[in-house]
Amino acid sequence: MNPDEVNRALGHYLNDADSGELVVEDSTTVQVKNPEARKTGDKIEVFYSRKTTVVSPTNSDDEDADFCSDSELLPQQEGHRSRATSFAGRIRAGSDDEAMPKHTILRYRRKKGGQWREINLQGTPDKRKDDEDELEVDVKEDRSEQTGIVTKTYEARWKVLKYEHLPEWLQDNEFLRHGHRPPLPSFSECFKSIWSLHTETGNIWTHLIGCVAFFFLACWFLTRPDNHIQFQEKVVFSFFFAGAVLCLGLSFAFHTLSCHSVNVVKIFCKLDYMGISLLIIGSFIPWIYYGFYCRREPKITYIAMVSVLGIGAIVVSLWDKFSESRFRPIRAAVFVGMGCSGVIPTIHYIITDGVHSLFADNSFHWLLLMAFLYLLGAGLYATRTPERFFPGKCDIWFQSHQLFHTCVVIAAFVHYYGISEMAFARLNEQCPVR
């Protein structure tokens, strides 16, 4: 990266301030989001943001105020040096009698390797070509009537990108061709993006809604009077509620922040996988507890078994390469294998109590439906169906990850209903005297 090019771009506004304005404060933030790339030779990504405070002459009724915005994430292409690009435009400064803030939106486009050009938003809509990048600059000007000080802020708005325009660390599913968020190295910008339409919108909202629903369901359940639901049952169900809320909440956070930066993605990706393991553990505990309600030894043994398997899955998910796209089938296999460990206590129960009791007393039909939904979702996720067969047609809706999320939320509610029936049946029976 050439520092002179960066300095030249960031100083563009000061060089163009020829309207008699006195610059009082000019603050620029430059963040290198992947400094390790200097050693590895990978693409360098830089984020620029700028805020300028100027004093304008009191007789500048008809003068224009120059502005520029240097807020853009600039990936360094292989074989080329990274370049910082400035954007220049004009807005009317107005009179001193007008103390109202001014707000202008400008839009720029450029071809690959070309110069940015301003698009006229007032005239005939200019259709964007496939080989062009687009950027919106949000300009806000706040003038003080008493002092004549003008505070200007510039914000570059992100646009959804095609898959091939993404940096390598954001290229997860090549069958989703368009509608991706660009890198947004700002937590506030990432969370603002949940209100926009892009490839992660469905993934974010499916688990956000599920997380909120389970949170309030848990609050209702755990605050019931003890003569309705005893404290011991509240403790047992708490494992399931905690697993569901953490799994869905961490998944929501990961998909919201998945475009922030490499390091943030690595952290929240591991938390996302940890949440899946916690949901599996939390789902097993009440089922085993009520399934072997009158038998302490198998109850303790199987709860310990699933806890150890869950911890093992968490340890495996901490491996950095575990989150890579090529390990997608292995990820699905790890969690499916952990869920299938429930076959062992099921066979035990059939041997001791029979198949009829398994369905009549343990609501096993609901657990089978839950297992089917989890396996269906995992299968769609691992094979990237349906977008594999319709590339570019499922970019926003009905992609495999959204369907997987939907299956998870529905399966969790099915499981809650099933273990509730199990608990009701067990609490209304007497354990046999042994």
UniProtKB/Swiss-Prot annotation:
Please give the SMART domains that the UniProt record associates with this protein.
PAC (SM00086)
- Describe its membrane topology: Multi-pass membrane protein
Q: Where in the cell is it found?
A: Membrane
Task: Tell me a GO cellular component.
Answer: plasma membrane
Q: Where is this region: Disordered?
A: 74-103, 118-137
Q: Taking the first listed entry, what is the main subcellular location of this protein, grouped into a coarse class?
A: membrane
Positions in the Extracellular compartment: 223-234, 295-299, 353-362, 425-434
Q: Which parts pass through the membrane? A: 202-222, 235-255, 274-294, 300-320, 332-352, 363-383, 404-424
Which biological process, per GO, is one annotated for this protein?
Answer: adiponectin-activated signaling pathway
The stretches that face the Cytoplasmic side, renumbered to this chain, are 1-201, 256-273, 321-331, 384-403
Give this protein's Gene Ontology molecular function annotations: signaling receptor activity
Q: Which UniProt keywords apply?
A: Fatty acid metabolism, Lipid metabolism, Membrane, Receptor, Transmembrane, Transmembrane helix
InterPro entries in UniProt: AdipoR/HlyIII-related, PAC
Give the protein's biological function.
Probable receptor, which may be involved in metabolic pathways that regulate lipid metabolism such as fatty acid oxidation.
| PANTHER family assigned to the protein according to its UniProt record, in alphabetical order | ADIPOR/PROGESTIN RECEPTOR-RELATED, PROGESTIN AND ADIPOQ RECEPTOR-LIKE PROTEIN 1
What protein family is recorded? Belongs to the ADIPOR family.
Q: What is the recorded name of this protein?
A: Progestin and adipoQ receptor-like protein 1
- Origin organism is Caenorhabditis elegans
Q: Recite the lineage of the species.
A: Eukaryota, Metazoa, Ecdysozoa, Nematoda, Chromadorea
